[in-house]
């Protein structure tokens, strides 16, 4: 008669043969009873954090929801059970966690196999039997050669069992992460085993970064290290990346996993490759340990047990293959099997490791659920943080740095640049000018939007007086400040540009000129008649080299040139004095 564990293992074998019907990846791992409970605990804590702000959940609530979830998924009656609060959110978060970790639990595989009718009569399992097995109510005899004693006698035996469980969990976590790079539970167990300096702070930063990029934690760490090591200037990691503090530690961890992957890809024999993988992990865990340490001895026993299991798996596979292919020529592998998920030379090793992990998934669940859920005391013996404590990482603070560091650094730099920037020198006495000159100009001069567009009517056009009262002749664009404020040092270009005017002139009209020694303005008869009576008159000078033309074209293309040539009161006299 087939044992119950063997029936569940046959379910998983059926899943491996028809994996495209179940999952998108051949490397999908099976979540056993203990890991199902741990995943539910983390999912409930995450939902509680969203609703109440605290990443925590009581053991009684976990066990109540666990019992209700098993009945719900197996389709069993739960009339006498009350639905837990936020059960729908707990269930959704649980399935989301498994999907993001590329895992399927035993119940999902069972339901899929039953729906597809992939089981024979002898392999069928009743839902109530599966419920009793997962919940731990069924008495299951361990017949897979486990190194763990069934009933520890005294405290010393209990301590040795805890050490053995911890060592076994470390090995299976390394193998699971090697096969399934999305397994966040496996990563949390071995990220800092042995001590690499990647404690809770590093795990917190990795978790936040992985959620921002919607990647698994291990793939996020791998992507960061690859960017640091091989990225050029264009794709280098940011200087303000919080993971830069842990570059060395993360690099050591990623390089070790890469070393295990190289063993899988380079050694074609799965027996040799499996033994070398176990030996590499063993030497890695034993660093700093002496022969008399309990952990050292536990690692030795676990390696021997796993090595024996790998050999038994390979032998059983050869027996099945020999029995099924007797007298039949070997066929070529299917097209989708080649290079699907791994290099072809390492496929046999990966398949052996998957079978090893599947056998561990069907092992009997832990009887002491409280010890499984809250194992802080047990893990403190090895200086390890529990999975729940790791995932209880606080949210990143946003109050200490409201703006990015680059903006906070750039702001004072820009302020210094603004202080150092000065206006261009307008004359040799510009350093003696007051800062109120710009205010005076803004008060006495009109902007380009305030001055109407230049027209070309008849020479004698009457303009509105309000433009003159504000200090500007809209036609000739002559500013009136009460005194002459024109620059004497104009070159020929400015004189030529000043010949433009808003109104057309007659060829016989006289040019307006300025006399620096007089305060009166004279005109010719034509220009005088075009001005209103209340406008101030300008006086011209007979010296053409000191000519100042304040008339700018209607399109005001030379507005900047005119603004640079404006002088304050008394500057023209000082300039003439120093010329003498």
UniProtKB/Swiss-Prot annotation:
MF GO annotations: DNA binding
Main localisation: cytoplasm
Entries under InterPro entries matching the protein: P-loop_NTPase, PARPBP
Region (Disordered): 525-565
Any one GO BP annotation for this protein: negative regulation of double-strand break repair via homologous recombination
Subcellular localization(s) per the UniProt record: Cytoplasm; Nucleus
SUPFAM superfamilies, per the entry: P-loop containing nucleoside triphosphate hydrolases (SSF52540)
GO CC annotation: chromatin; cytoplasm; nucleus
Keyword terms: Cytoplasm, DNA damage, DNA repair, DNA-binding, Nucleus
Signal sequence, renumbered to the chain: none
Gene3D superfamilies noted in UniProt: PCRA, domain 4
Lineage top rank: taxon: Eukaryota
Family designation: Belongs to the PARI family.
Function: Required to suppress inappropriate homologous recombination, thereby playing a central role DNA repair and in the maintenance of genomic stability.
Name of the protein: PCNA-interacting partner
Gene that encodes the chain: PARPBP
